């Protein structure tokens, strides 16, 4: 196993522990708490994949971080912070919408890279909007936290989420996953539109209805892809 992979996991575990202590003092805002919860799932998945104990890794990560801080001067820290581009966290959904449980009458699921696409194909003839919470850097989607499809009544009928055991995805990965979700939902004559935030940062091009133009052949192909890979 690559030593950098192990040490990266150890540092991530310790930094999560620090953030958890911060949250326990009721100091974190909603985006902070949301990332904390999702990063916990990611660490569990990575720990299982690597065969590493999280508690042991956290202690090792603490030693690594302490060593770095001992060697770090205040001036070097200022220069590092100044050179790192700042990302923004954008929210279409409330914390309640993100954490709400939902179920599917006719579940369909597809794994695309490090993203999991889920939808209820029992939903027909509905107006649906896609909403997401994600971070943006250089005016492009950086990391998808969660995307969900909502009916006008507020019911959740679809979802795109990162797989905890496979961290890392690009804006193109997210764009392709959204296309698959839209294709599957439109297969049952649902009308799907995308939130303005997603249009701006994930799609870059859309029609007047607020969704990307998908040719009928592409929609049918996407829907068949989901059915064949479940």
From Swiss-Prot:
It comes from the Viruses. Residues 205-230 are annotated as: Disordered. GO terms for cellular component: host cell cytoplasm; host cell nucleus. The keyword RNA-binding applies. Residues 223-230 are annotated as: PABPN1-binding. It is found in: Host nucleus; Host cytoplasm. Residues 180-215 are annotated as: CPSF4-binding. One of its GO terms (biological process) is symbiont-mediated suppression of host PKR/eIFalpha signaling. Its main location: host cell. Residues 1-73 are annotated as: RNA-binding and homodimerization. A motif (Nuclear export signal) lies at residues 137-146. One of its GO terms (molecular function) is RNA binding. HAMAP family: INFV_NS1 (MF_04066). The dsRNA-binding region is required for suppression of RNA silencing. This is Non-structural protein 1. The gene is NS.
